[in-house]
Amino acid sequence: MTERAQTAPGRRTLLGAAVLGTAALGLPGTAEAAGRGAPDARGGGHGSYRDLPVPTVIGHRGASGYRPEHTLGSYQLALDMGAHIVEQDLVPTKDGHLVCRHENDITGTTDVAEHPEFASRRTTKKVDGVSLTGWFTEDFTLAELKTLRAKERIPGNRQENTLYDGRWEIPTFEEVLRWADKEGRRRGRPVWLYVETKHPSYFGGLGLGLEEPLAKLLRRHGRHRADSALILQSFEPTSMQRLSKLVATPRVVLLSGPKERPWDFVESGDPRTVADLVEPAGLKWIASFAQGIGPTLDLVIPRDGAGRLTTPTALVSDAHARGLVLHPYTMRNENTFLPADFRRGTDPNAYGDVFGALRVYFEAGIDGIFSDNPDTALIAAADFAKS
């Protein structure tokens, strides 16, 4: 029996709460007692994103290390474990609803292939220059998507998670907002959300732009202000620029490999790459419309040819010098995803020395981390805070 099977989610939750305390869990603290006022449990008036605990632990697609990603079950577990923020990725349906999926291709994360009534919807598309064959959210109405059920995306790595296949449907973002509002009222504090617009240029070209309907939902739920308990993010900087004109919610630009170009840059002919954006001039430009960056971990500490960590880059200090927070992605507990110097044993799906890896990244000065296993990251953050 593995350690994961021996430790129940409830035990993880209690341990995280006991170790971190109310401040790290985002509970009301001395600032409010001094007169800032009680936060709005719907997600507004909570104070700045800069008041979040550092390192901030972001539940990546919920607690996707333990449940099928982007389900209410995954979000609930991340929150119960004590994650400071819970992440959602947004894609549209054919009839314009925003739903929570990491990609518009739902072949690997739902049971759509088992629905004969949708067999003819299988098609090949080019999304951001990549040819994909499968089933896509923009070809389904919301009512049709609601007949599907979510499943584990990487069952080869996380066989235990397949136990929960078929348990949850695809949530709309509005359903998630209602869930967060309800949980906020129950807990007496806002539930922070981290919301990504996926492939905004692609969807804009289909007449399914993401920014306007997203802004409308944020205003409806009181999460459109600078002090709202929500952060927006995108790999396309122009999506954040558009949203900056619609809502005051904090914004983060996501950054992938150094040689890659954001797809909106490709379409507009902007020659800059991610390598250009992480230079001081690029960071200064990002700081003109965003409050942070979400770089891949390799932009913070590169790996060598053997997959081992090398020397940290200047990205943390350069970003901080321009007032930007850094929330890199993604930490996962399994050996196969860890730097080679923190893998343990020969089983790629066994857990490695995650605590050791997280300490190195925290020592580099990052402000937070996206993690599939928020309970692990919370304990690592508490260990780091005590050191």
Which stretches of residues belong to each language-model region?
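Phosphate-group recognition and catalysis centered on beta-loop-alpha active-site segments
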Residues: T2-S387
